[in-house]
Design a protein with these regions (language model features):
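Helical (often loop-to-helix) elements that flank the catalytic cores of nucleotide-handling enzymes
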Residues: 125
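Short S/T/G/P-rich N-terminal loop/turn motif that feeds into the first structured element of a domain
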Residues: 1-97, 101-104, 121-122, 139-168
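Short loop-to-helix capping motifs
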Residues: 115-117
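Short hydrophobic/aromatic beta-strand micro-patches
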Residues: 79, 111-113
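A common structural junction motif
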Residues: 129-134
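Short, surface-exposed coil-to-beta transition loops
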Residues: 105-109
């Protein structure tokens, strides 16, 4: 399965939302949930969509679990040595995809899909996640909301980094 990640797409928001609504199982418009607000586009097995972008980052799937649906998408970028990538793939749970960068190096991404922030928080506190994290070299995480409406990208939307009501 071919996966592409487009960082900070240059197309208008309306065009990105249309691409997503036309192919909801393949295109995910992602809005970062942090002060470093920005958007990315995750494209799964839709080369016709990838062709519309100048700088997609290509990946090949190594493990696929469940379905790609949810309001919260958690991304982990990491490197792996030896056969740690295979061990990490065996620990995947829920709705997730693990992919290796097309450049042939030991650079990987995991995208996991969650209905709520509470579900993601439970996973991040789990023993399985701790085991996965211990096998990763230089892990870097980003959490996104699944953007379905232009209003989610408004500058008037409250940043949630320090919102105790949001994070609990």
């Amino acid at each position: 399965m071919k996966i592409n990640l487009v960082l900070a797409p240059e197309q208008p928001v309306s065009e990105l939302l249309t691409l997503q609504s036309d192919q909801p199982q393949n295109v995910f418009y992602l809005g970062k949930i942090s002060q470093l607000a920005g958007t990315n586009l995750l494209i799964i097995d839709a080369q016709n969509v990838v062709a519309k972008f100048a700088r997609p980052i290509g990946f090949e799937s190594r493990a696929v679990i469940g379905q790609f649906k949810g309001n919260v998408i958690h991304q982990i970028a990491f490197q792996a040595k030896d056969n740690n990538d295979e061990l990490i793939a065996k620990l995947l749970t829920g709705n997730a995809i693990m992919a290796q960068n097309d450049n042939g190096k030991s650079e990987y991404m995991i995208w996991s899909f969650w209905s709520t922030h509470d579900e993601l928080a439970l996973f991040l506190a789990s023993e399985i996640y701790q085991q996965m994290h211990a096998l990763m070299k230089n892990p870097y995480t980003t959490t996104y909301q699944h953007v379905t409406d232009q209003s989610q990208l408004s500058l008037t939307t409250k940043m949630r980094d320090f919102d105790k009501e949001w994070w609990g």
